[in-house]
Design a protein with these regions (language model features):
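Active-site histidine-anchored catalytic micro-motif
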Residues: 1-165
């Protein structure tokens, strides 16, 4: 947009082009991997940081961004501390906001019995994006990546997509 240009610079429609690092046309890469999970319980939190780090190593990307998202509407990917008391607090908090029973509480449950799981996923989020620097995830000291399952005991997938150079 012309209004977004810096003073003294002019926007020429059609002049913007995607650029790759270094101008050699081959600097930007992308990598895609699916992680599959099947939990033993209906609701479960699983630390997937090591699996995501393995995807990053396999990608060979040193600088960029990593997207990790749950590919199912009743599961979540989020970042937090790996502490069992905190996980119990999540469970209590989410159950207070969207209790599993009675199933009649949710209009959605006329078709299925997982209306609560849809709400829990909405609260905890679909994905995380993490900066990649020097081939490492830029996570804080206690930050870990988690898969949150709210309607489990069946096979579900998480997508890891990495872009960078």
């Amino acid at each position: 947009f012309e209004g977004d240009c810096l003073p003294g610079r002019h926007f020429v429609p059609g002049s913007a082009r995607p650029r790759s690092g270094g101008g050699d046309g081959g600097g930007m890469k992308s990598y895609r991997q699916e992680l599959w999970f099947e939990t033993a319980k209906r609701r479960e939190y699983r630390n997937i940081t090591a699996s995501v780090e393995e995807c990053l190593r396999a990608s060979g990307i040193r600088e960029g961004l990593l997207l990790c998202n749950a590919m199912h509407i009743t599961a979540s990917v989020f970042i937090n501390d790996d502490e069992s008391g905190l996980h119990a607090d999540f469970e209590e908090w989410l159950e207070g906001l969207a209790p599993e029973k009675p199933h009649s509480r949710y209009r959605h449950n006329g078709f299925e019995d997982n209306g609560d799981a849809h709400r829990k996923r909405t609260i905890m989020g679909r994905e995380v994006v993490v900066a990649v620097t020097g081939g490492k995830l830029e996570l804080g000291p206690w930050e870990q990546i988690f898969y949150g399952e709210f309607d489990g005991m069946r096979k579900k997938r998480v997508l890891v997509k990495i872009i960078g150079a």
